[in-house]
Amino acid sequence: MGGELVTGLGALRRRKRLLEQEKRVAGWALVLAGTGIGLMVLHAEMLWFLGCKWVLYLLLVKCLITLSTAFLLCLIVVFHAKEVQLFMTDNGLRDWRVALTRRQVAQILLELLVCGVHPVPLRSPHCALAGEATDAQPWPGFLGEGEALLSLAMLLRLYLVPRAVLLRSGVLLNASYRSIGALNQVRFRHWFVAKLYMNTHPGRLLLGLTLGLWLTTAWVLSVAERQAVNATGHLTDTLWLIPITFLTIGYGDVVPGTMWGKIVCLCTGVMGVCCTALLVAVVARKLEFNKAEKHVHNFMMDIHYAKEMKESAARLLQEAWMYYKHTRRKDSRAARRHQRKMLAAIHTFRQVRLKHRKLREQVNSMVDISKMHMILCDLQLGLSSSHRALEKRIDGLAGKLDALTELLGTALQQQQLPEPSQEAT
C-alpha cells in the first residue's frame, strides 16, 4: 500500500477513486452478510420443519454459509485496506504502517471476529428427536444451544448497514458537503446521515426501522423459545408478543419462558421506548406551524388580544362609573356588586395584557433573525451606494485638479514667453 506521494489534483482524484471503491466494497460486504443471514434462517427453519430427512441439504446450506463468510472476511480486509490508503492520501504518507494504528488493528480484528462467527459444518444436525415429541420434551429436536448462539450471533453482521448507507448517501463524495462541513467543523459520520434521513424521510425511516426490529426480534424470540415447555416458540405467537412488548402495552396473554426470551423481550421494550420517542418528536415537528402560518396566527392573535384589552378597559370604566354612581346614592348592595365586577374586570384586563405581552415577545424573538438580516442587507446596500458616490466624487475632484494643473501650467508658460516689441529692440 506504499508508493510515491501524490499531491494536488492527483490526490483529489485518488481520494474520489478510493471512496468509490470503498462504496462498492461496502455494498458487496452487506450483500454477503445478508446472504449469510438468509442462509442461516433457511437452515434453522429447514431443520425445524423438515428434520433429518434433509440432512444433506442442511449440510450444503451450512457449507454455503461458510463460503459466504470467507468472502465476507476478505471484503472486510479489503475495505480497511482502502481506509488506510485513504488516510495516507489525506495526510501525505508513504508508509502504510504509520497509518495503521493499534486502535484500527483492534477494530479490524473485532470485525473479523464478529463476521466470522457462524455455525461451522463439522457435524450433522442435532435431530435425535426430530419429528417426534415426548412428555419430557414436547418439541421436536432443534438447534443445539451452542449452534443456536452461533446462528443468532450472525445477526451482528447488520452493523454493516450504517456503513453502506453512509457511503451510498453521497455525503462523502459531495464536494459542497465536505467544504461547508470543514468550515463549520462538522464530521460526516453515521449519526449525521441518520439525522439527515430523519429530517428528509422521517416516515420511511421510522417505518423501516420499526418493521425491521419487529421481524428480527420476533424470529430471534421464536428460536430462543422453540424448545421451551410453553407454546411461545411459534412464530405467530412471537409476531404478536413482540409488537405488544414494543409498544409497551403488555397484555400478558403470551409470555416468554426462557431466560434468553426474557432478555429479548426486555431489549424489545427498550427499543420500543426509543422508537416511540422518535415518533413523538417527528409528529410534533410535523404538527408545528411553518413560518408563514405562524406569522398569520400571531397576527390574528395580536388583533384578538388587542380587542379583548379594549373591551376589558371599557368594561372596567363602566363598572367604575356604576360603582361611583351607586356609592353616591348610598346603595351599598349595588355598590358591592359593581365593585366585584370592577375587580373582575381589572383581573381580566391584567391577564389579557400579560398574554398580549408574551405574544409580542414571541413574535419579536421570531422576527429578530430575519429582521437583523434585512437590516444588515440594507446597511450593506447603503454602504455600497455611499462608496460608489464617494468614488465618483473623488474621480471628479481628480479631474478638476488635473484641469487646474493644466491651466496653471499654461498661464506660467505664457508669462515666461517675451513680447514681440522686446525682441525687436
Swiss-Prot record:
MF annotations from Gene Ontology: calcium-activated potassium channel activity; calmodulin binding; intermediate conductance calcium-activated potassium channel activity; potassium channel activity; protein homodimerization activity; protein phosphatase binding; small conductance calcium-activated potassium channel activity
Regulation: The channel is inhibited by clotrimazole and charybdotoxin but is insensitive to apamin.
GO cellular component terms, A-Z: cytosol; plasma membrane; ruffle membrane; vesicle
Residues with PTM Phosphohistidine: 356
Signal peptide: none
Stretches that traverse the bilayer: 30-50, 59-79, 105-121, 141-161, 205-225, 263-283
Non-traversing membrane segments, not crossing the membrane: 239-259
Catalytic activity: K(+)(in) = K(+)(out)
Post-translational modification: Phosphorylation at His-356 by NDKB activates the intermediate conductance calcium-activated potassium channel activity, and conversely it's dephosphorylation by PHPT1 inhibits this activity.
Bilayer topology term: Multi-pass membrane protein
Gene3D superfamilies, per the entry: 1.10.287.70
Coiled coil ranges: none
Compartment(s) of residence: Cell membrane; Cell projection, Ruffle membrane
InterPro entries, A to Z: CaM-bd_dom, CaM-bd_dom_sf, K_chnl_Ca-activ_SK, K_chnl_dom
Location, primary (coarse class): membrane
Function: Intermediate conductance calcium-activated potassium channel that mediates the voltage-independent transmembrane transfer of potassium across the cell membrane through a constitutive interaction with calmodulin which binds the intracellular calcium allowing its opening. The current is characterized by a voltage-independent activation, an intracellular calcium concentration increase-dependent activation and a single-channel conductance of about 25 picosiemens.
Domain statement: Transmembrane helices S5 and S6 form the ion channel pore, which is surrounded bymembrane embedded helices S1 to S4. The S4-S5 linker, which contains two distinct helices, undergoes conformational changes upon calmodulin binding to open the channel pore.
Description of how the protein assembles with itself and partners: Homodimer. Homotetramer. Heterotetramer of potassium channel proteins. Interacts with MTMR6; this interaction leads to selective dephosphorylation of PI(3)P in a lipid microdomain adjacent to KCNN4, resulting in a decrease of intermediate conductance calcium-activated potassium channel activity. Interacts (via the C-tail domain) with CALM1; the calmodulin binding is constitutive, does not require calcium and mediates calcium-dependent gating and four calmodulin molecules bind to one channel tetramer.
Matches recorded under PANTHER family: SMALL CONDUCTANCE CALCIUM-ACTIVATED POTASSIUM CHANNEL
Stated family: Belongs to the potassium channel KCNN family. KCa3.1/KCNN4 subfamily.
Name by which UniProt lists this protein: Intermediate conductance calcium-activated potassium channel protein 4
Organism: Mus musculus (Mouse)
